[in-house]
Amino acid sequence: MSDWSINDARTGYNVNYWSQGLYGISDTGEVTVSPDPSHPEYSIGLNELAKDMVKSGVALPVLIRFPQILHHRVNSVCQAFNQAIQKYEYQSDYLLVYPIKVNQQQTVVEEILASQVSKEVPQLGLEAGSKPELMAVLAMAQKASSVIICNGYKDVEYIRLALIGEKLGHKVYIVLEKLSELKIILEEAEKLGVTPRLGCRVRLAFQGKGKWQASGGEKSKFGLSASQVLTVIDSLKQSQMLDSLQLLHFHLGSQIANIRDIRQGVSEAGRFYCELQKLGANVKCFDVGGGLAVDYDGTRSQSSSSMNYGLTEYANNIVSVLTDLCNEYKEPMPRIISESGRFLTAHHAVLITDVIGTEAYKPEVIEEPETEAPQLLHNMWQSWSEVSGRADQRALIEIYHDCQSDLSEVHSLFALGQLSLSERAWAEQVNLRVCHELRDVMSPKYRFHRPIIDELNEKLADKFFVNFSLFQSLPDAWGIDQVFPIMPLSGLDKAPERRAVMLDITCDSDGTIDQYVDGQGIETTIPVPTWSAESPYLIGFFLVGAYQEILGDMHNLFGDTNSAVVRLDDDGRTNIESVLAGDTVADVLRYVNLDAVSFMRTYEELVNKHIQEAERANILEELQLGLKGYTYLEDFS
């Protein structure tokens, strides 16, 4: 297609929308990142960046982090709420809290905290949902506001550690997830001589919609019902500790796509807040939890991988609803807190890797079957003759269904021993040739052609064997059908000639990506340039900075990938910082309690027994290097 342009590529991969301006396609067809939005004139070509890393000894796949994106996301959220507070004359302030469960990597947490270093009054706190996370935030929270929110189920040790946090100078809010926690908190606080800051997670009747909707609603795993909240109030009054209840928390679920759901949830929780104030509580903080979505597919819709609102609209809705409620009840306006971890981290990381090979259909010359061949084969030849002779548009559909039916019968007859292997192979090739021709002559402008075109694209798609583990690097794509943007990193200045599916290198048929961003929709295949060993290109998986690393597992013992931090300086120069090596074979063996040292001793015994002396040293060296090597394939150079 000679009229192909870069704008066609940008539209086809929808990059202008899901990337939020952080990623793009250059005029030469290469994917770029602009990690510092304060300097949009500076960008980095991801293809060259990855190749430079490989030359310096960093094997693919590699996860690349852009910390300046983290800084930008933090400041964007704070700015949106600050502007909303000013717009609606809200009489309090805003605090952004990062739940470290989203990505606990030290680099990520420290860069998020660093985004507030220059602020006179930091607007950033940290959230922990377990004892290990609490131990981490106790050591890091002082770099921002020193506010810590403790969620999740708690035992005595967790509660004592949280209370000790107050002694260390932090402002620690212990959120009640169940009634039994209150008694323990009050007892341990008295022992330690600490006045606790309590929060209460309320279980709303309203439930948002999405993949994580079970986090909200009356059947939620966490939170207190209305009657349980009243029990907490009564218990605190009896203990003369009602002033300790300082935070109200609710959570609709992660990735809330519809702004109406957010508005309705805030409205119900706001009523809880106002009623608690009427009962004598002194709640100072209103924590809306998570839910601020990421537009993974760029469709700006209510799909589970998108969002039908922007950051400004999100902040405006929360602030305006609370303003109206507090004015209605004549209650003081609380500090607004949100826990927007996914929004902060998703965009900052991209996984780059190589294609190790492809399997592509190429039309073959097919001979007409012999006269004595089974009638079924002649029927299939007739279908091929009709489609190659350009049958009319409606006949094309009939030809397609006839050919699929005939192929199914061929397989049945082969299983019964009534067709030979060569006859089956011939039939399969004819079927592929018919499908290939149909895809070329059918048109999406005919509504009744569209579902068949989708089927044909999937049936004829190239298989790309990609050097990564879906289970390790994109577990949500496997586990919950999460959509992630995927693009070739180069060659996008020319019209894509193929459609493909991406398969990982695990020995599992589930290691296949089933959904791809394609224009303003989701398809089961992705348009790509022709790939060959002589002209290979790299693949980028985008928006993988939230949850994927910590949720990833070691299926087939593929471990953590190499990673690197990349930053632009003020002059637009690219600096590759803190390269972190991925897991070695010995590392992953150790995770499953297999001892590489004892394996080496066994290898030595086997080598001495079976290998001639002249070869022993070389064989042992290769075995040792195998244990020290990367768990992924290392042929790309």
Curated annotation (Swiss-Prot):
Catalyzes the biosynthesis of agmatine from arginine. InterPro entries: Ala_racemase/Decarboxylase_C, Arg_decarb_HB, Arg_decarbox_C, Arg_decrbxlase, De-COase2_N, Orn/DAP/Arg_de-COase, PLP-binding_barrel. Substrate binds at residues 286-296. The gene is speA. It comes from the Bacteria. Belongs to the Orn/Lys/Arg decarboxylase class-II family. SpeA subfamily. Keywords: Decarboxylase, Lyase, Magnesium, Metal-binding, Polyamine biosynthesis, Pyridoxal phosphate, Spermidine biosynthesis. It comes from Shewanella sediminis (strain HAW-EB3). Pathway: Amine and polyamine biosynthesis; agmatine biosynthesis; agmatine from L-arginine: step 1/1. Its EC number is 4.1.1.19. GO terms for biological process: arginine catabolic process; putrescine biosynthetic process from arginine; spermidine biosynthetic process. It catalyses: L-arginine + H(+) = agmatine + CO2. One of its GO terms (molecular function) is arginine decarboxylase activity. This is Biosynthetic arginine decarboxylase. The keyword Lyase applies. Its cofactor is Mg(2+); pyridoxal 5'-phosphate. The modification N6-(pyridoxal phosphate)lysine is found at residue 101. It is an enzyme of class 4 (lyase). The keyword rRNA-binding does not apply. The lineage of its organism: Bacteria, Pseudomonadati, Pseudomonadota, Gammaproteobacteria, Alteromonadales.
